[in-house]
């Protein structure tokens, strides 16, 4: 990795500091502070910070604060906080709109090392505000003891349920009234929260009640009314029954894998099933490294990110505990794809869409949850419920 000793004076004393306590807010020249969540890559990023210190003389403090998003917004809004914040891309638009993030301009050769769709997640208003690290997506998790080959469509799952029901088991469960999960059906044939354009998202163009979205919602009604998915199924019911070996498939993500391994379930991950002729489409998240607009050390931040953290070697170190899952770096992902579950996670993201990273998504979540609840309970027809959701989003 490149060294900066020829350019930057070494610090007289420099140590790696990693803490879960309250973060320091003041910036210091020639010293980097990174805030990130504590659930992925914690050990690996500390190793990279150590290496950066050894090779450049620049201290890197890695902090894992509670309530990171609120604290970053407060600190950065007053010109303080970390130089680099690592978080899911969905907060990027809000922070960029508030002037809290710097645009980044990686070279074409650097960009080519990462999947194009992960760079799309790092865009706001057509400009790049972060570096993609890893990808998290829903998939169809299946119990190999109950199904040899994962079903390709919901039609196949409905047929499978007729057989499994005779044994007291189910073909599929998922938390249909939670928009993150239920939306996958509505997106299959063209539903969208806000229309994606080259310049970002057109918040006046809402597609939650278009023909494709209604088609997905009508399938959901059919699944519930035929008792393929029992009315009232939520995440805890799904997770509990799947871990007991009572369910052949569920729609969930990598966060469910550790519990399955503890339960001794022999599981696989596949593409989400088709709604008609089209795959159900997840909204995927991308863990992203962003640079604070208040940082006086943006040159150092780019050096650490591009030549250390996000190099192939750096990604391997960052992921030394295996917690990143699917990654945005093409060559390193090819290595990880020996694990078919990690490969399937990336494949689901490739057919899905990045979760829109704009503040208006709050209106989407708030409108879609009651809409899906009303569809699931039968209080409203799919068209009525989705029309109401669209009206609420426009308010």
Please provide the spans of the model-predicted regions.
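Conserved N-terminal structural module of periplasmic/extracytoplasmic solute-binding proteins
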Residues: 12, 16, 25-94, 108, ...
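Hinge/lid segment of periplasmic solute-binding proteins
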Residues: 89-139, 149, 154-158, 185, ...
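Short helix-initiation/N-cap motifs at beta->coil->alpha
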Residues: 64-72, 90, 156, 230-244
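Long, aromatic- and glycine/proline-rich binding clefts that accommodate carbohydrate-like moieties
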Residues: 270, 319-367
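Extracytoplasmic/periplasmic solute-binding protein
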Residues: 129-133, 138, 158-205, 247
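Glycine-centered hinge/linker elements that transmit conformational signals in sensory
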Residues: 161, 202-232
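Extracytoplasmic/periplasmic substrate-recognition and gating elements
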Residues: 33, 50, 55, 126, ...
């Amino acid at each position: 990795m490149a060294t900066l000793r020829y350019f930057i004076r070494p610090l007289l004393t420099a140590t790696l500091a990693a803490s879960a306590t309250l973060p320091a807010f003041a910036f210091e020249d020639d010293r980097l502070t990174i805030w990130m969540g504590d659930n992925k890559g914690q050990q690996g990023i500390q190793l990279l910070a150590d290496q950066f210190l050894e090779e450049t003389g620049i201290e890197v403090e890695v902090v894992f604060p509670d309530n990171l998003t609120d604290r970053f917004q407060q600190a950065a809004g007053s010109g303080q906080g970390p130089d680099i914040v690592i978080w899911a891309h969905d907060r990027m638009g809000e922070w960029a709109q508030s002037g809290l993030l710097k645009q980044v301009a990686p070279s074409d050769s650097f960009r080519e090392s990462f999947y194009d769709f992960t760079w799309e997640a790092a865009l706001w208003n057509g400009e790049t505000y972060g570096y993609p690290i890893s990808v998290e997506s829903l998939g169809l998790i299946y119990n190999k003891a109950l199904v040899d080959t994962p079903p390709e469509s919901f039609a196949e799952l409905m047929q499978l349920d007729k057989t499994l029901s005779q044994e007291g088991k189910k073909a599929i469960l998922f938390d249909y009234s939670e928009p993150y999960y239920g939306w996958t059906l509505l997106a299959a044939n063209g539903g969208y929260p806000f229309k994606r354009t080259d310049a970002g998202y057109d918040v006046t163009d809402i597609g939650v009640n278009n023909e494709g979205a209604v088609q997905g919602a009508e399938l959901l009604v059919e699944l519930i009314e035929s008792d393929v998915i029992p009315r009232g199924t939520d995440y805890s019911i799904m997770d509990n029954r799947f871990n007991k070996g009572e369910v052949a498939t569920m729609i969930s993500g990598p966060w469910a894998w550790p519990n399955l391994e503890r339960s001794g379930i022999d599981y696989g991950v596949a593409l989400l099933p088709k709604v008609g002729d089209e795959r159900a489409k997840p909204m995927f998240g991308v863990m992203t490294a962003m640079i604070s607009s208040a940082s006086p050390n943006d040159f150092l931040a780019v050096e650490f990110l591009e030549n250390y953290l996000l190099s192939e070697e750096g990604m391997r170190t960052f992921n030394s505990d295996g917690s990143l899952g699917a990654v945005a770096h093409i060559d390193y992902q090819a290595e990880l794809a020996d694990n078919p579950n990690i490969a399937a996670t990336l494949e689901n993201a490739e057919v899905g869409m990045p979760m829109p990273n704009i503040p208006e998504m709050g209106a989407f979540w708030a409108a879609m949850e009651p809409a899906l609840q009303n569809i699931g309970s039968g209080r409203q027809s799919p068209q009525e419920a989705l029309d109401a959701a669209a009206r609420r989003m426009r308010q």
